[in-house]
C-alpha cells in the first residue's frame, strides 16, 4: 500500500499527471454528483418533465459549446506560451464563444416549431430569453475550466465543480414543488451563473497575473495569425466532434418521446463520463506538450499507459454492471439503456488512442491532420447512426460509435506509433513546424 501511495505522490510531482489526475477527479466528482442530480430529478419530477429537462439542457449545451469547446484545443495549446497576452487571449475566447453560441441559440429559437414538441416549452419571450442567457453563461463556464488547465491550475477545477454540483442538487429539490415544470432547467442554470463570479476572480486576480510574471519576458507570445492558422484546422474538426457529443442526442430527441429520451440520455451521459476520463489526460498532454515540446513522445507514452490503466477497469465494471447501474434510476432505464451503455463504454478503448493522437497533433500545431481525423470520425459516427437508427433505435448511437472509433483507431495507429517512438512525426516535426510558424 505504501508503495502505491509513494507512486501516486511521485506522479503528482509530474505536471502531466497532476493536471490529468485533477481533470479525472473532476470527471468523477461531476459524474457522481450528476448521477445524484438526475436520480433526484427522476424521483421529484414526472417522467415527461425529466425527459424535457434533459432535452433542453442538451440543446443549451450544444449551442454554448459550438465555439467554446472549439477553443479548448487552442487555449490548451497557446495559453502556456501566451505570456503578457494571456488576459487578451482569455477574454477573446470568452467573447467569441458567447457571441457565437448566442447567435446559434437565437436561430434555434426562431425556428422552434421545426424541432418538435419537446422544445415547445421554450416558446414565448421570457422562456426564450432565459434560454438565450443560459447559453451565454454556459459558454463562459465551459471555457473557465480550460483556462485553469492551460495555466497549470487544474486542481481548482474539481473544487469548483464540487460546490457547483451540490448547490445545483439543493436547488433542484427546492424547486420541485414551486416549479414542477421547468424546475430542472432553472436549477441547472442559476448555480452556473453564480459560479462564474468567484472562478473568474481567481483567474484574472491571481492565476493570470502569476502566469504572466513567471513567463519568459524574452519569449514572443503567439501572433493572432499563428493562432488563426491553428484554429483553421482544429476548430472545424472540434465542431465536428461536437456533433457526436451534443447533436446526436438532440436529433434523437426529435425522433422519440420525452420519457424514452430521458432513459436514453441517462445511459448516454454515463458512458460519456467514461469517455471524458480518456479526454482529460489528453488535454493535459496538449498543455505539457506546449510547455515542453522536447518531451512530447515521452509524455504521449505516459499518457497512453495511465489512460488505459484507469479506464479499462471502469469499462469492465460498466459492461458487467450496466443493468444494475441503470436500475438505480428505475427498471425502465435498465431495460432500454443497458445495451447502449455497454456499447458506448466499449468504444472508449479505441477513443483513448484517438485522443492521445489528437493531443500530440495539437502540441505540434498540425492543423490539417487535426481537421482530417476529427471530421472523418464525426462523419463516420453520424452516418452510421442515421443508417442504423431505423433498425436498432437508440442503440444505433452505440453501434455507430463503436464501429467508427474502432475504424479510426486502426487508421491512425501507424502515425501514433511513430510519435510514441519520437520519429519524424514526433519531436522533429514539432521543431520543424514551430520554426515554420515563426
PLM regions: where:
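Membrane-interface junctions at transmembrane-helix termini in multi-pass inner-membrane proteins
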Residues: 136-160, 291, 346-375
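Transmembrane helical elements of multi-pass membrane transporters/channels
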Residues: 18-34, 157, 161-168, 184-207, ...
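Interhelical loop/hinge segments that connect adjacent transmembrane helices in multipass membrane
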Residues: 2-15, 160, 177, 182-188, ...
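Membrane-water interface segments that mark the loop-to-transmembrane alpha-helix transition
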Residues: 18-30, 56-113, 122, 126, ...
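Hydrophobic alpha-helical transmembrane segments
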Residues: 125-129, 158-209, 380, 394-419
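Helix-loop junctions and terminal segments of transmembrane helices
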Residues: 39, 67-84, 150, 267, ...
